[in-house]
Amino acid sequence: MRLIVLSLLFTSTLAWFYGRDEPDRWSVGGVWPLPQKIIYGSKNRTLTYDKIGIDLGDKKDCDVLLAMADNYMNKWLFPYPVEMKTGGTEDFIITVTVKEECPGGPPVHGASEEYLLRVSVSEAVINAQTVWGALRAMETLSHLVFYDQKSQEYQIRTAEIFDKPRFPVRGIMIDSSRHFLSLNVIKRQLEIMSMNKLNVLHWHLVDSESFPYTSQKFPELHGVGAYSPRHVYSREDISEVIAFARLRGIRVIPEFDLPGHTSSWKGRKGFLTECFDEKGEETFLPNLVDPMNDANFDFLAEFLEEVTETFPDQFLHLGGDEVSDYIVECWVRNKKIRKFMDEKGFGNNTVLLENYFFEKLFSIVEKLKLKRKPIFWQEVFDNNIPDPNSIIHIWKGNTHEEIYEQVKNITSKNFPVIVSACWYLNYIKYGADWRDEIRGTAPSNSRYYYCDPTSFNGTDTQKNLVLGGIAAIWGELVDNTNIEARLWPRASAAAERLWSPAEKTQKAENAWPRMHELRCRLVSRGYRIQPNNNPDYCPFEFDEPPATKSEL
């Protein structure tokens, strides 16, 4: 009896210390992100591999749905490393009905992802307007499937679900300039994105450190700017990523940051300004575009035409952040630039020179043959005169309240916004930062689950201008070896915030049993998903392939 009492006392003390319950408390057949409306039935249905099928109806030739059926039937519905039972008594057919035709290209902004899913003991029925909605429904259905340890059987919960996303933009930003990311690693993140119902990959392709994008028209860019000839993405590589993303209902938005963060563009002669230190000596690292040279704008026009031919998405991210970090060295101390400013009547006002550059860039974007809606980081709004057609990408704010004030200010000027400031996942501290405020970090760099981009005092018109959010993972200390575990499941907190109803997702303590089940589900599917709720375990843990004999 004494041992039992001590054990109970120790367990409850741990629960208090970690701020959570027992480490095996997870939901069973819980859906992540939480649907708009879900009603569970009272019965479960045993599933066996030989008695389950998918009926695509009149869309049986649609490549998106065929890939979906293959992925779920052969990998994701039955992910656990257990012997599959066969010989069920009745077939279980998943019937998929999609109203619109199978699209030939990737999803477009605002495409419907709404679906209705009904699961009974005899069948499952999916109804969706688009194939993208059907993809989301199938992922939800897979969350209803669980492995019962006692009966050693796969079962599915019966349920009726109506669902659609809260925001049209729900994404991840990856940075392949600071550290090159392989195609396989990028594809793995796309798979996990689809399992979290995220639909935008913001690809920060180039930055000061390297230029891995292969330009067919201007091969000198990657020829000089890439880390090595191996650290590049060919047009075929990019097309492969876009095609892979499409089959999972994900758009790919490229970013080419201008006019700063451009050291790696050094292969283009005359594109960058000369920069000088306090003694007037030229520095080795120019990092701003030379706005004096009209040939640079001709080059950008041709270069961006090529980019739009490579990336089909209607959004194009053109950066615009942190220009002020380089202005003194590269513009103020540059005598040629100062003379140009005098000739233009700008005096000492470098903001006017920035405006000059951006006006030229806006004109280039407006004249693109394949029309694009530009996205800019928020400095272009804060310091300059943004094109009225622009989307403003918010990355600043030390608290959630400061972030909300930024959103309020920008939307009050009638600009649509995308929010990333809440979810900078490259910042790491010890603890469950998805739900807790972590000591030593700004609140915006923790408590990811609690950031709601529309939690500001504004009009409905303003709140409708909030397109959604993108969780960012900057690459200074992130590469192929750690991006997956660092992203997931922390990005899953943002995924639920951007998909699910705000009023139903107010408390992380109510969400973490579902997140625990999500983590274990993804681990069983073969992904490196780090612990997120302090001490816990999964029924089937992640494992590496066995060592070869030579390693023993």
Swiss-Prot record:
One molecular function GO term is:
beta-N-acetylhexosaminidase activity
- Residues that carry a glycan: 44, 348, 409, 457
Which InterPro entries does its entry note? Answer: Beta_hexosaminidase_sua/sub (IPR025705), Glyco_hydro_20_cat (IPR015883), Glycoside_hydrolase_SF (IPR017853), Hex-like_dom2 (IPR029018), HEX_eukaryotic_N (IPR029019)
Q: Which domain of life is it from?
A: Eukaryota
Report if keyword Hydrolase is assigned: yes
Q: Which UniProt key words apply to this protein?
A: Glycoprotein, Glycosidase, Hydrolase, Lysosome, Signal
Pfam families (UniProt xref): Glyco_hydro_20 (PF00728), Glycohydro_20b2 (PF14845)
Q: Does the keyword Flavoprotein apply?
A: no
Enumerate the active-site residues: 322
Gene Ontology annotations of biological process type: carbohydrate metabolic process; glycosaminoglycan metabolic process; N-glycan processing
Enzyme Commission number(s) from the entry: 3.2.1.52
The record's annotation in Gene3D superfamilies points to: Chitobiase/beta-hexosaminidase domain 2-like, Glycosidases
Any signal peptide, and if so, which residues?
Answer: 1-15
Spell out the reaction equation it catalyses: Hydrolysis of terminal non-reducing N-acetyl-D-hexosamine residues in N-acetyl-beta-D-hexosaminides
Please give the GO cellular component terms listed in this UniProt entry: lysosome; membrane
Annotated compartments: Lysosome
Q: Which family does it belong to?
A: Belongs to the glycosyl hydrolase 20 family.
Q: What does this protein do?
A: Responsible for the degradation of GM2 gangliosides, and a variety of other molecules containing terminal N-acetyl hexosamines. Degrades chitotriose.
Question: What is the protein's name according to its record?
Answer: Beta-hexosaminidase A
Task: Please tell me the species this chain comes from.
Answer: Caenorhabditis briggsae
